[in-house]
């Protein structure tokens, strides 16, 4: 595939917690940052240790700045050039995904990838030339129980729809997308949205995220008439969890089922993309994968941060996370710079500014710098002239001159004053509108860092130290490889048959160990598959309960003929991921709104409403006594459902 590049995958291991130490759990995961390797060891002697290699590995003592500069900085740099970029944190619940993405606000060194990206973006803008104009917009959403919610909206519990257009791609309809002028405003919006996000306590995490969150930064830039648009998606996924460990019940259990289902779909998408033989990628099976469609196998530069815990009692979940991460390394994306995109707002604002300036120029031609002063001077001249006329008029009135000329002058004076007031008001509106739009656009070279200047400096210093250490590491690695090559050459020179036999024995032992590892790998895959099947069965049992409850409610409260009517006129929409009603304009509520009020058909002292009154009034339904409990169609459907569920 031309221009394709693989998804970058990094692994971060959190420190072992005090609770885990008190419970006697040991460390099962060791990280080698230099070799970019993660080693996981089981308590069972039968299972050999596993080693996985990634694009970068962060041990428990790695600081937030290093994580940002290694994993996130290259993505943000590309977004500023006009590419799409995605950074998402994946892993078991309680492994530090939210800390990696958001971190703590204070001290500055503890901030995560999202706030650090704010400082990076505006530091870049401040260093650009004055001939480059920027427009920065943000959005913040969560996917809670398969419902998309706008975290920046006052009504953050509303369910939004996913739409798709050929010129724009996948987007969320009616999602708030405010413009920002500095990093402080971005930080304030992130904090506001984070407060609206769904969190809850479980046995594994007191502040467990109960939803997937997606913070998106859209950066448009214009230089020499060319508009580019980069989109940065920062995703904090909810963690996979087992009910036996989290102790989730009731609402928490329902949330966990939805989270596991969407993460299972994400795993299926990754598997299908890596397989290469799959003709269908199941993006539409969940709203999460639908929104990540470009990030996985599409037009985006993507980094996956796999978060793991070090304790032995999380061995199975950690191994599963590492397997998914190892598989994701083979996903290929084809990223391209977005030039003159259809949904760019920067061009629209520039045209609006030109139109407003043209109107202001017509009012008072001249240079932009002196235009406002000249207009104000002109207004003052008119006011002085009017003041002179007012004095003359007052003298005429005081001298008791009350002829037609005086009335004409009074009328003219009032019209001039109204005209002057209107001109000043319209000018102020135009000027205010122009300033408001210009404020949204950011000119390169302006210092917009404000309070985050210290943060930007820390990132820059850390990045320079990182580059220097990489250079030294590369130099040392070259020396090590040279010495290793010499050593291998010496070892391969057999001085006797005994040495040759010794080397052959080593090779046999190596192959034997590889065979042992392969068998253990197969065993782990079988166990992992069994765990996935058990998790799916748990989800099916939970969904079965909800389904039976809904069926019981329908049987008890909705007449059968109306159920059949509903079934006849509904169809499943793959695009919306929901049931759609045909001819919705002719449904009861819409028709009732335009119909005259219905006559009252009953009268009793206690004002109770008979059961199914609304159905009889609107559609002439049969009474409960003469209505059969079930129809043949529904009866057959119930039998099929019972067979499926049992």
Swiss-Prot record:
GO terms for cellular component: axon cytoplasm; axonemal heterotrimeric kinesin-II complex; cytoplasm; kinesin complex; kinesin II complex; microtubule. Residues 525-550 are annotated as: Interaction with klp-11. Residues 342-552 form a coiled coil. Residues 629-638 have a biased composition (Basic residues). SUPFAM superfamilies: P-loop containing nucleoside triphosphate hydrolases. GO terms for biological process: anterograde axonal transport; cilium assembly; intraciliary anterograde transport; microtubule-based movement. Pfam families: Kinesin (PF00225). It is found in: Cell projection, Cilium; Cytoplasm, Cytoskeleton. Belongs to the TRAFAC class myosin-kinesin ATPase superfamily. Kinesin family. Kinesin II subfamily. Component of the kinesin II motor complex, a heterotrimeric complex composed of kap-1, klp-11 and klp-20. Interacts (via C-terminus) with klp-11 (via C-terminus) to form a heterodimer. Furthermore, within the heterodimer, the C-termini of klp-20 and klp-11 interact to form a coiled coil (stalk) or tail domain, and this is necessary for association with kap-1, and kinesin II motor complex activity upon IFT cargo binding. Prior to cargo binding, the klp-11/klp-20 heterodimer is autoinhibited by the tail domain of the heterodimer, which folds onto the kinesin motor domain. This is Kinesin-like protein klp-20. It comes from Caenorhabditis elegans.
